[in-house]
């Protein structure tokens, strides 16, 4: 009795199918790469499960992928004898996109074919790529270990729905038949398929086979009889683990295709490193830095990590234990000789072998990035634009490598006059003034706010470079990166400016004299502002601005407060120190005011101006506007 059901595709699948058909038309042949890759994964998964249950092989342990075409019918079939799927598995995997953050993925689509094809590639088109060339797709599958009459038939024309039915299938595994559109019949050509397999699937460790027709008996050139040959399944790829081959034998094209196979990325990797480690631990790693950040890089639920093999046997995807979180963009694999074949995520979590391998792999990736930064600054900037903000998590997470990570960071700076983050800490050190012992920086809401901050006035006048930070993560970074190569990082908006030997003796004396003369004014402002400030001081950092606010040493900065509030964390009340510039005409006129009410209004106006400049917003903007209008009106009378 038939058990046919019709199901509607998940909304996101409908969108993805539509976009793929219209966006990936320039590279249609990737459908075969994706389907062969999935078939190889199914073989890997069966091999892993059979480690503890040999019966799953059902007497056939020779795993392989077979591809055949029928020109007359216009079909291509990709068949594997891997793990197969159950009915529930078919509905789940071939009807929905089981990935977190799909809404964000679709939000990022621009409608521009070239950009969207890249994004779709990053998402991993997988099985759905079949519809790039097929008007209809038929899947027959049986899960390993299940009865022949528990197999499943899945069919769809890639529109709004698919059907599922129960069938009988003697062999385990999955068979996918693509009924090609009329304009895509080129893919039913045997030689076309062979060229695609050679191009995309040479590195796959499972044999990929195509049917080789036999030849009838025939006469040779000297009249002798050449016997007939039988047809057979011919292996079309090298079918060896690429990472176990000698580096000198592997071309760049093979490395790039293997990257696309394991990452499901649509673009080439930026760089890679292939190494065999011998000693206390023996393992091989093949690590890739992508050229583009995945669309869900910041999604907390996103899985990341390396593929783990033990003695060439696939164990698991996303083994995050071998890579710190700040390097989560790294793709690749690790093949260990030391871990047991029955290793689990729990065993990996607290294992001295894992920890030693993690340390070695982390150093390897940092070394790759250091070499790239040294040898190809332009390419490194390309990397930084994609992954720089993730790398900034490193100093908080990896104390042992803090200095190395810091050397890889890039910032905007007053030296370049550009918003582009191209300045390294070593660049900064090389330009430090004689007698300078600190690395000065500012964190603000935007590059413009940082570059135009009044806190930079004195430093600009003295020609002292300041690093300009404006990313959300910068305040977090700077809380964990307090020095570099024995030079302290010093915020120009926090505490005393501390110029040390850069401070001119005559200037210092004049500053102290001005502070002494302004003491009565400072006390008046303190009284006028009351509890709204922690203190009032004469500034040493302003030259052109009447006043600024400064965060006290040990206090939470305005940027950190914003971060905490955005995360829904409780934030303590922090009162700023208000610094005035008595040399500015506004402050000088303020000192002459005898009307204490007007004096208090002007003091408040200057304070709120300074807070607006520092934070980009006010707690009560309406009160500020009301005060401003009141002052304007009073001066217009």
UniProtKB/Swiss-Prot annotation:
Keyword Cytoplasm: yes
Annotated GO MF terms: ATP binding; ATP hydrolysis activity; ATP-dependent protein folding chaperone; unfolded protein binding
Subcellular location: Cytoplasm
Pfam families, alphabetized: HATPase_c_3, HSP90
Location of the region described as A in the Swiss-Prot/TrEMBL record: 1-345
Recorded GO CC terms: cytoplasm
Keywords: ATP-binding, Chaperone, Cytoplasm, Nucleotide-binding, Stress response
Main localization category: cytoplasm
Region (B): 346-562
Family: Belongs to the heat shock protein 90 family.
Protein's recorded name: Chaperone protein HtpG
Native source organism of the sequence: Shewanella sp. (strain MR-7)
Primary gene name: htpG
């Amino acid at each position: 009795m038939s058990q046919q059901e019709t199901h509607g595709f998940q909304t996101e699948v409908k969108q993805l199918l539509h976009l793929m058909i219209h966006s990936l038309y320039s590279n249609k042949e990737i459908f075969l790469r994706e389907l062969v890759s999935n078939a190889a994964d199914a073989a890997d998964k069966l091999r892993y499960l059979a480690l503890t249950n040999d019966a799953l092989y059902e007497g056939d342990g020779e795993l392989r992928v077979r591809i055949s075409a029928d020109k007359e019918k216009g079909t291509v079939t990709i068949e594997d004898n891997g793990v197969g799927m159950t009915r529930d598995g078919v509905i789940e995997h071939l009807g929905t996109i089981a990935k977190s953050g799909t809404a964000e993925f679709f939000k990022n689509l621009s409608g521009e074919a070239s950009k969207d094809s890249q994004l779709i590639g990053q998402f991993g088109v997988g099985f759905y790529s079949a519809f790039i060339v097929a008007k209809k797709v038929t899947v027959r599958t049986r899960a390993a270990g299940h009865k022949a009459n528990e197999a499943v038939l899945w069919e769809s024309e890639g529109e709004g729905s698919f059907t599922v039915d129960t069938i009988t299938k003697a062999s385990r595994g999955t068979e996918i038949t693509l009924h090609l559109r009329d304009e895509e019949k080129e893919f039913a050509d045997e030689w076309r398929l062979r060229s695609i397999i050679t191009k995309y699937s040479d590195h796959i460790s499972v044999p990929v086979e195509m049917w080789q027709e036999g030849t009838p008996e025939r006469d040779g050139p000297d009249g002798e009889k050449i016997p007939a040959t039988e047809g057979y399944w011919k292996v079309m790829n090298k079918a060896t683990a690429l990472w176990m081959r000698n580096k000198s034998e592997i071309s760049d094209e093979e490395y790039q295709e293997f990257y696309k196979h394991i990452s499901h990325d649509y673009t080439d990797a930026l760089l890679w490193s292939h190494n065999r480690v011998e000693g206390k631990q023996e393992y091989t790693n093949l690590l890739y830095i992508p050229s583009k950040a995945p669309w869900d890089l910041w999604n907390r639920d996103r899985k990341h990590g390396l593929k783990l093999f033990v003695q060439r046997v696939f164990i698991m995807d996303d083994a995050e234990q071998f890579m710190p979180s700040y390097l989560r963009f790294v793709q690749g694999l690790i093949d260990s000789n030391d871990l047991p074949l029955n290793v689990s995520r729990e065993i990996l979590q607290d294992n001295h072998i894992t920890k030693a391998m993690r340390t070695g792999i982390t150093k390897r990736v940092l070394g790759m990035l250091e070499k790239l930064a040294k040898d190809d600054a332009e390419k490194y900037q390309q990397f930084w634009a994609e992954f720089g903000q993730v790398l900034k998590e490193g100093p908080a997470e990896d104390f042992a490598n803090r200095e190395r990570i810091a050397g890889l960071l890039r910032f905007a700076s007053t030296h370049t006059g550009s918003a582009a983050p191209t300045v390294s800490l070593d660049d900064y050190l090389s330009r430090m003034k004689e007698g300078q012992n600190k690395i000065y920086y500012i964190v603000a809401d935007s590059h413009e706010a940082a570059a135009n901050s009044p806190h930079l006035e004195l430093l600009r006048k003295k020609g002292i470079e300041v690093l300009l930070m404006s990313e959300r993560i910068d305040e977090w970074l700077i809380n964990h990166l307090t020095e570099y190569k024995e030079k302290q990082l010093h915020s120009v908006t926090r505490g005393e400016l501390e110029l040390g030997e850069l401070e001119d003796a005559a200037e210092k004396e004049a500053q102290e004299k001005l502070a002494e003369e302004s003491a009565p004014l400072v006390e008046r402002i303190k009284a006028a502002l009351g509890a709204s400030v922690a203190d009032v001081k004469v500034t040493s950092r302003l030259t052109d601005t009447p006043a600024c606010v400064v965060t006290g040493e040990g206090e939470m900065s305005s940027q950190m407060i914003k971060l905490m509030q955005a995360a829904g964390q409780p934030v303590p009340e922090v009162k700023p120190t208000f610094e005035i510039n008595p040399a500015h005409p506004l402050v000088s006129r303020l000192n002459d005011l005898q009307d204490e009410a007007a004096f208090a209004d002007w003091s408040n106006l200057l304070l709120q101006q300074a807070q607006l400049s520092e934070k980009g917003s006010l707690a009560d903007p309406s009160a500020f506007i009301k005060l401003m209008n009141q002052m304007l009106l009073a001066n217009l009378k």
